Amino acid sequence: MTVPDAMTFGLFSMNMDACSYPEGAARIARLAEAAGFDSLWAGEHVVLPDPQAPPSPMAAGDSILDPLIALTFLAAHTTTIRLGTGIIVLPQRNPLVLAKELASLDALSGGRLILGVGVGYLEPEFRALGIPFADRGARTDDYLAAMRAIWTQPKPAYHGRFVSFAGVQAHPQPTRLPILTGGHSPGAYRRAVEGADGWYGFALDLAGTAHALDRLLDAASRYARPASLGELEISVTPRRLPDRDEAARFAALGVHRLILMPPGGLDESALTDYVSTVERSLIR
């Protein structure tokens, strides 16, 4: 099967492993841009459980840079490739501070930022930050609404459960900053349908993707989607590097972008080979 021209490919882990060092990160970012990747992605964990405990896939000593700082660095070393957070754990952030940081990065990158957000899943991380784990879904909804208000309203004002403000301004306001919501809960699917430009599924195979998209369709039948948002863009990080046939099958399910995650622990040479392999096997 042929991979549709409309499908795009992102590169994950741009703030980890070889990309947690400046020289390697800059070289891999430029290589990915030249290879035809449409986007670079960075995830987030402020802290990791020690000792490692399920469901954390990362060891306590694994290095992971702050995604916004990493993407700002990558923006300075690239020109056209988009820059995505995959994902920001939104309820762990101050929404107005985050809104300012995101608007700044979007401005400095020339409008290349894609904001991926999720509610988080590591209770020890929330406990260390002093944020109630049980409130994370409600906080995410509240924070998204507050950020949209500060970004879009001529005289921003918002009064919610966890954040309230009026009589303030914050510029620059992004012209168009797409928002993807991640997660596999009923709330995550509702959040995507009601107010996001896209949905992001992580570590899914074809069957898992089909199941998730069925649940998104069910959510779309239950919740109203503003016409201004248009079609929901679907991004998926597959469990492993797909071949052309598998990529085409993802596209046939309705996936618009595959965000590819290299195996953990690759050095710069091996990551260079990975990018070149993707270019030959999927992009060109």
Regions found by a protein language model. Name each.
Residues 1-284:
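Active-site-adjacent structural elements that line small-molecule/cofactor binding pockets in enzymes
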